Amino acid sequence: MKYDLLVIGAGTAGLSAAIYGVRAGLKTICIEDAVYGGQIVNTPEIVNYPGIPTITGIEFANQLYQQATSLGAQVFYEQIDGLDFGLFPKRVHTTRCEYQADAVIIANGARHRKLGCAGEDAFEGKGVSYCAACDGNFFKSQVVCVVGGGNTALEDALYLSRICREVHLIHRRDTFRASAAVVEQVRQTQNILLHLSCTVSEILGESTVNAIRIADAVGDAGEETIPASGVFIAVGLQPNNTIFDRWVDLDSGGYIVAGEDCKTKTEGLFAAGDTRTKQVRQLVTAAADGAIAATGASQYLYSKNSKK
């Protein structure tokens, strides 16, 4: 099947790209291996998207999907098992068939890295969150935990300290990986309590989280149970871009190297959203990337066709 534009992923960046693609007159398809919407469907309420005071993650995803498909974009749910971006048109092979497209946007996102402890999956969306900026306000004046030792974890702890009564910051090492200025700010914040050289052994609760159990990572101090209403996990993101590494450059974290124009090193191949190198990974930046990448793809195809 032949398309003008093929988008890999149907999250916020992917569906935004599809909207801009079809509005530019491109025959557009999204290939998604899970559910449309991406990570945002796990967020109970979105309160930081400009122009929309409040909306659930599922509602937001539904509206994006309906807007894209009503304009004419197609969304297929298939696993990609091969590709060739060196040809024109480019080829994407799935478990069902081969797709051809003149331009491709990679918008497969990046998944939050999980701890892998007991209770994590059971309480996701019920007290376990991977986004303090998205969900922190649900825990106003309550006790929460943040797990991680990098800039994101410490910045999350600082953000939550202004909302929550008490923040327990848990890190498996005895020193933080965050910048010195952020570490000092955390240490000076009275309602942030540090638990260094500790690992999370279990997240506890009934219908929602009510405690977290941590263990001494280096000695034999045993375990401690901390009563808490929320657990914010910030141990990094995990892109899955090795299938593309022949056609794009990857940074040390596995993200696709692409600038603000979303262009990769391969002609006609773009990267949008959380999958690419960037400083801020939020809903609004993913939507912006999708628009930029699709506009770039449209300009690329116009330029290519005008030379024929």
Would you name each region that the model predicts?
Residues 2-4, 77-78, 140-142, 197, ...:
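Phosphate-coordination loops involved in phosphoryl transfer and adenosine-cofactor binding
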Residues 3-71, 154-180, 251:
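Beta1-alpha1 glycine-rich phosphate/pyrophosphate-binding loop at the start
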Residues 10, 108-109, 235-236:
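Glycine-rich, N-terminal phosphate-binding loop of Rossmann-like dinucleotide-binding domains
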Residues 11-12, 35, 110-112, 150-152, ...:
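Residue-level detector of alpha-helix initiation sites
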Residues 68-87, 91-93, 98-101, 161-259, ...:
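A Rossmann-like FAD-binding core segment of flavoenzymes
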Residues 75-138, 149:
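Glycine/small-residue-rich loop that forms an oxyanion/phosphate-binding "nest" at active or ligand-binding sites
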Residues 116, 122-138, 234-282, 289-292, ...:
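FAD-site-proximal beta/loop scaffold in flavoenzymes
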